[in-house]
Structure formats: structure tokens, C-alpha cells
Regions:
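C-terminal transmembrane helical hairpin of 12-TM major facilitator-type secondary transporters
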Residues: 291-334
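Paired small-residue
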Residues: 101, 112-121, 314-322
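Juxtamembrane intracellular "pre-TM" segments in multi-pass secondary transporters
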Residues: 9-18, 199-231
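Cytoplasmic helix-loop-helix junction between adjacent transmembrane helices
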Residues: 117-156
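Helix-loop-helix hairpin linking two adjacent transmembrane segments in secondary transporters
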Residues: 113, 142-144, 151-198
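Conserved MFS/SLC helix-loop-helix module at the cytosolic interface between two early adjacent transmembrane helices
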Residues: 73-111
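Helix-to-loop junctions at the C-terminal end of transmembrane segments
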Residues: 75-86, 277-289, 372-373
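Helix-breaking motifs and short loop linkers at transmembrane-helix boundaries and internal kinks
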Residues: 54, 86, 107-112, 141, ...
Length: 406
């Protein structure tokens, strides 16, 4: 971290001495929280939205998770133009604009408009998300990188828990419209945080004369077998995560569990353990390596899936805890791996990874939603298990120590 500059407020570089590690971790985590809090918070009110728009669970689930479509597109766009984008300014603009579609969701007249606004949200969220990952990769020292990425993913985890709790509470007491206005205010708070805490950085093309063209960077990344595997793993992780935490909402409110809207929000305390464990991902990789850490994470998530089929709230909650801990730990591991495997054009590599990651969420929503509607929850869980298995197979390609690109 850079020392504070009084005339500019507290501006922080994402590197530095141990005395600033805690403050750096808090800033990184809070930035992540405010960047993606809209992504999953709406899932806590999925049953209420389905009733309001009078549509099926699959239709509402696809509309809510269509934000991942925008995120995939934005991830690719940012990866193309990453070398020309000032990190801090890009993050600041993305979070500011994000508040507009978020507020408009409060007055969306139909499902088509709702879906379009969620896509717009995704475009803004992914732009900020991708640029922040690139910023961390470029500004962190090798020793600090694992902890920085773990802190960022931990903020993501916290947004899942707190976002869902807040969304359920606000919607239950003040209505669906107030819920979206509240989250628009959080988006603006994120922009303010970035303005006062993130140090200025130059576009990468200004940092050296040998910058590659965007398409050359893409080709280099896709020729790297380890990066290709990591991109596929990202796809599978969000496929499994969204498949679980979108459609389990409908299982929880139906017999025999039959919990209410406010109780549904409190269910997401299942993410609390993930907030603690995800911070340890960097240490785990440093001690055991990328591949064993990923396999252990995916296995833990797989162990939780059968519990989701039992007619017991305690069993389902335990299963959700295990799936959450496993998938978030795997995400933090894969994200950090991509940053180090791509020793050049990290913004481009992060963009491709996030495009694959969020595409997995969209595909998972579409496919598993149809399975849920037409075949049932057990078949849906089977599809989720399959995606974790594919991720485990892809992890074979990852070496203990990432290889550098030429």
C-alpha cells in the first residue's frame, strides 16, 4: 500500500508492509462486496418475484441470473481493451453507472424489461470486477497476491450472505421496489469507496513499449493449456453454484420445508463459514499447491450435494454450507492461478476467465432450470454434481506452480 497522501485522502496501493495488511484486506473485501452485491442478493426474493411477475421458477431464475450474460460480455470487452483502460477510472465509472439499472428494476413493468436491466447490471458489475482483478494482479507483490485475491473473493462471499439477508429484509418490510432503490444506493457507495481508497494507475499500454494487441493476448492465453483448463474450471464453478443457490430457494419454500420469505433470507447464514475459509485459500495454495487445493474444494462441495435432497432443513442447510465453502474456495484458487499463469496482459486473462465463469452461470441457470421444472430437484442436483466432476478432471492440467507464458 502507498502511504496516505493528505491532499488526496487515503489512497491505497494493493501492496505494502505487514502493518497495512489488515486495512488493505478490508478495503479489497469491501470493494468486492459493493461491486457484486446486486448479483446474488435478488436470489433471496426469487419466489416473491416469480409471484409478482406470475412466471415459473425457471423463467424467473433465468431473468434474475441473466446478469451473468452481461457479465460474460463485459468480461470479454474489458479483456479486449484492457491495455487502454485506466483501472481506477474504469472501476469508478462502472460502479456509478451500475446504480441506474439497479434503481430502474424497481419499476420494471414486465419480465422482458426486468431481464434487460439485469443484463445491464451485469455489464457494469463485470467491468468493475475484471478491472479490479487486473489492478490487484498488477499492483500486488508476489507475496501479497494470494491474500489479496482471497480477500476479494471473501468480499464476494460476504455479498452473498449480507446481500441476501438485506434483500429479504427490505423486500419483506418495505416491498420489492424499495429493495432495488436500497441496492442502487449501495452501488453509489462503492463508487465513493473506490474514489477515496484506490490509488491512480496508468493504462497498461503506457507502462511499457512491448504491449501486445488484444487479439494477440487472447491467442497467447488460449494457447496456454493451464489457462484453458482454468477458464473451463471457472465455467463449471459458477454453473454449480448458481444451479444450487437459485433453485434451492424454491425447494426451501415448498413442502416439506415450507419456510417463509424472511426465514429464507436467514437461511443464507450458510455463507458465514465461507467468509472465514475463503481467506485461507492463498495459504492453502502456497502450502499444498493449486491442484490439491482445487480437488479438495470440489470434493467438499460434492459431499454437500446429496444432503440437499433430504427432507430435513438441518441437512439441507449443512449441504448448502459445504457447497458454499467448496465452490468459493475453488473460485479463489482458480482466480489467483489465472493471475499468476498469465504473466503478461493480466487484464485480458482475467476478462476471459470471468467471461467463462459468468457464462457458466448463465448456462447453468438455463439448463438446470429446465431440468428443475420438468424432471425435478434430484435431477438438478445430479447435473450440478456432473459439473463439479468436469472441473475436477480439468484441474489435472494445472501444475503445482503455474508456468509462465512466452
Amino acid at each position: 500500500m502507498a502511504h496516505a497522501v493528505p491532499s488526496e485522502g487515503v489512497r491505497m496501493r494493493m501492496q505494502g508492509h505487514s502493518s497495512g495488511v489488515l486495512l488493505r484486506t478490508i478495503v479489497i473485501g469491501l470493494t468486492a462486496f459493493l461491486t457484486v452485491v446486486d448479483l446474488f442478493a435478488t436470489q433471496a426474493i426469487l419466489p416473491s418475484l416469480a409471484r409478482a411477475y406470475q412466471v415459473t421458477p425457471a423463467a424467473m431464475g433465468f431473468a434474475v441470473n441473466s446478469s451473468t450474460m452481461g457479465m460474460a460480455v463485459a468480461g470479454l470487452a474489458v479483456s479486449l481493451f484492457s491495455q487502454r483502460i485506466n483501472r481506477r477510472l474504469g472501476i469508478l465509472i462502472s460502479l456509478s453507472i451500475l446504480s441506474i439499472p439497479t434503481a430502474l428494476l424497481a419499476v420494471a413493468p414486465d419480465l422482458t424489461t426486468f431481464t434487460a436491466l439485469r443484463i445491464a447490471q451485469g455489464l457494469c458489475m463485470a467491468s468493475a470486477f475484471t478491472l479490479t482483478l487486473a489492478y490487484l494482479g498488477e499492483e500486488c507483490s508476489a507475496a501479497d497476491a494470494g491474500g489479496a485475491f482471497a480477500a476479494y473473493i471473501t468480499g464476494n462471499v460476504a455479498s452473498n450472505l449480507i446481500g441476501r439477508l438485506v434483500s429479504a429484509a427490505v423486500a419483506d418490510h418495505l416491498g420489492l421496489a424499495s429493495n432495488f432503490y436500497f441496492f442502487a444506493a449501495l452501488n453509489l457507495a462503492g463508487a465513493v469507496l473506490v474514489y477515496y481508497t484506490v490509488a491512480k494507475s496508468s493504462p497498461m499500454m503506457q507502462m511499457g513499449p512491448a504491449a501486445r494487441s488484444p487479439f494477440a493476448a487472447w491467442i497467447a492465453h488460449l494457447r496456454n493449456p493451464q489457462l484453458r483448463a482454468a477458464f473451463g474450471i471457472g465455467f463449471c464453478i459458477l454453473f454449480a453454484f448458481i444451479g444450487t443457490f437459485t433453485y434451492v430457494n424454491f425447494v426451501l419454500v415448498r413442502p416439506p420445508l415450507s419456510i417463509g420469505p424472511m426465514q429464507l433470507g436467514f437461511v443464507y447464514f450458510v455463507f458465514l463459514p465461507s467468509i472465514v475459509t475463503t481467506l485461507l485459500a492463498g495459504r492453502a495454495v502456497h502450502r499444498w499447491g493449486t491442484r490439491p487445493t482445487l480437488w479438495s474444494s470440489l470434493a467438499l462441495a460434492g459431499i454437500g450435494l446429496p444432503l440437499l435432497l433430504l427432507p430435513s432443513l438441518a441437512a439441507v442447510l449443512l449441504g448448502m454450507v459445504l457447497v458454499g465453502v467448496g465452490t468459493f474456495f475453488a473460485q479463489a484458487t482458480a482466480t489467483g492461478f489465472v493471475s499468476h499463469a498469465a504473466t503478461a496482459d493480466r487484464g485480458s486473462a482475467s476478462g476471459i476467465y470471468l467471461a467463462c465463469y459468468f457464462a457458466g452461470g448463465l448456462v447453468g441457470t438455463a439448463i438446470l432450470g429446465q431440468i428443475f421444472d420438468w424432471i425435478g430437484w434430484p435431477a438438478c442436483v445430479g447435473g450440478i454434481m456432473l459439473s463439479l466432476g468436469v472441473a475436477a478432471v480439468l484441474a489435472v492440467r494445472l501444475e503445482m506452480t503455474p508456468t509462465k507464458e512466452n
